């Protein structure tokens, strides 16, 4: 392993943000076993898991630590994700402060119907805990372990991953640096450099863009329900979610040509009420928004997920619409497969894990893509839906809540399929 400096804090005090010491590597390349591109939750989780396994790693992130922590994302964790956080030594706060959920509610035709996730899935549940908090916990764990994260690394470029000696170059404080490594893990998201570094002829991309978005609002108000409410209405989809007992996250389906700034808080709350059942509408507590944004919805998969000594993980390889709460969980399962493969490589000198990484990931990815597409198609109003389509959706929802077989299928997928399926 390479010697590493103790963690330093930048002027902001964000954990793991290095403000000095980088210039010393300007002429002599750094060396690590695994170079991780991206310090979001998937990159940080992989870094912690590798560290626990005695595998050296350095993370490069093009944004600042503050920017990474400022991203508002999903907040529903499957048990597999919780187990990986535990293995990484970063689950203490998620266990203490996360909200275990044993069910969800489906709202259609003005009435709510509960799906017993726990009872239908053989005792599994999900945990509501914001991605921002997951990221914060992993950043703090990495800093406490003295591991190297280089934030604001510009012009990151990947080299030689189709051979035996890959490397990564980047610019920091105006100087170009080289990081030599055994493997590169691309955890830098849909717009990151990792997937774009692969020749177009070597990758096949599948994509579906949905004709609507989600207008989301974050507010420090108690949730309207202790479990999530998914609403199908003639006005469009709505979701009542939460981050804690005092912070709520709400969404309404909107058109792609709308802008968040055109929606006042009052207009949002009024529209949400119109999409809820009378009891929920009456109990809804409103307040000023902490954050308001519109997110487009898409399904996307890039195949394969391994290119020589480069591995893609998380949003770098696949995107799901947020309806099924699968994005962060898929990223975590990718990381789990890669962690296992690299432990096998370094511990047993076996290529079996890395050779089957892409196949294992994609088998799980496509099942989650199918579920997310199905749930999105069922709950949203499409331009072509019309009165007939609305009736079909309502009939399917009615079947779903009355049929134990159908409810079980929903529950199994929502809480997360087994890792070996």
Protein language model annotation of sequence segments:
Residues 8, 17-30, 325, 340-421:
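C-terminal helical "tail/cap" subdomain of flavin- and related membrane-associated enzymes
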Residues 140, 147, 151-157, 161-297, ...:
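Conserved FAD-binding catalytic core of PHBH/FMO-like flavoproteins
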Residues 70-74, 78-145, 159-162:
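Active-site-adjacent segment of FAD-dependent monooxygenases/related oxidoreductases
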Residues 67, 188-189, 320:
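Glycine-rich, N-terminal phosphate-binding loop of Rossmann-like dinucleotide-binding domains
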Residues 37-52, 138, 293-374:
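Conserved mid-domain beta->alpha element of the FAD-binding
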Residues 51-72:
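Glycine-rich FAD pyrophosphate-binding loop
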Residues 34-36, 57:
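Conserved hydrophobic helix-helix packing surfaces used for dimerization/oligomerization
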């Amino acid at each position: 392993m390479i010697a590493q400096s103790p963690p330093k804090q930048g002027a902001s005090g964000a954990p793991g943000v290095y403000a000095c010491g980088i210039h010393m590597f300007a002429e002599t390349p750094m060396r690590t076993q695994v170079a991780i591109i991206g310090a979001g939750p998937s990159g940080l989780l992989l870094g912690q898991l590798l560290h626990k396994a005695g595998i050296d790693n350095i993370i490069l992130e093009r944004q600042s630590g503050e920017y990474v922590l400022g991203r508002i994302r999903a907040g529903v964790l499957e048990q597999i994700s919780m187990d990986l956080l535990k293995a990484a030594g970063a689950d203490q706060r998620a266990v203490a402060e996360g909200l275990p959920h044993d069910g969800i509610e489906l709202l259609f035709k003005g009435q709510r119907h509960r799906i017993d996730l726990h009872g239908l899935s053989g005792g599994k549940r999900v945990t509501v805990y914001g991605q921002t908090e997951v990221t914060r916990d992993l950043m703090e764990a990495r800093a406490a372990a003295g591991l190297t994260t280089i934030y604001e690394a510009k012009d990151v470029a990947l080299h030689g991953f189709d051979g035996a000696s890959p490397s990564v170059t980047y610019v920091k404080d105006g100087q170009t640096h080289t990081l030599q490594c055994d493997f590169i893990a691309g955890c830098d998201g849909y717009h990151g450099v990792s997937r774009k570094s692969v020749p177009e002829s070597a990758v096949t991309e599948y994509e579906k863009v949905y004709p609507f978005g989600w207008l989301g609002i974050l507010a420090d108000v108690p949730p309207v329900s202790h479990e999530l409410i998914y609403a199908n209405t003639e006005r469009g989809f709505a979701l009542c979610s939460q981050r804690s007992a005092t912070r709520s996250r709400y969404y309404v389906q909107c058109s792609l040509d709308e802008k968040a700034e055109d929606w006042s808080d009052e207009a949002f709350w009024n529209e949400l009420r119109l999409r809820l059942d009378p009891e929920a509408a009456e109990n809804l507590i409103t307040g000023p928004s902490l954050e308001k944004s519109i997110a487009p919805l898409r399904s996307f998969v890039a195949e394969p997920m391994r290119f020589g000594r480069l591995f893609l993980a998380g949003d770098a390889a696949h995107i799901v619409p947020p309806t099924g709460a699968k994005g962060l969980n898929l990223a975590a399962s990718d990381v789990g497969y890669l962690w296992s493969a690299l432990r096998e490589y370094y511990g047993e000198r076996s290529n079996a894990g890395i050779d089957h990484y892409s196949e294992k990931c994609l088998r799980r990815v496509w099942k989650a893509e199918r579920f997310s597409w199905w749930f999105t198609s069922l709950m949203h109003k499409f331009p072509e839906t019309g009165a007939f389509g609305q009736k079909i959706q309502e009939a399917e929802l009615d079947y779903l809540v009355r049929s134990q077989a159908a409810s079980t299928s929903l529950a199994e997928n929502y809480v997360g399929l087994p890792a070996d399926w």
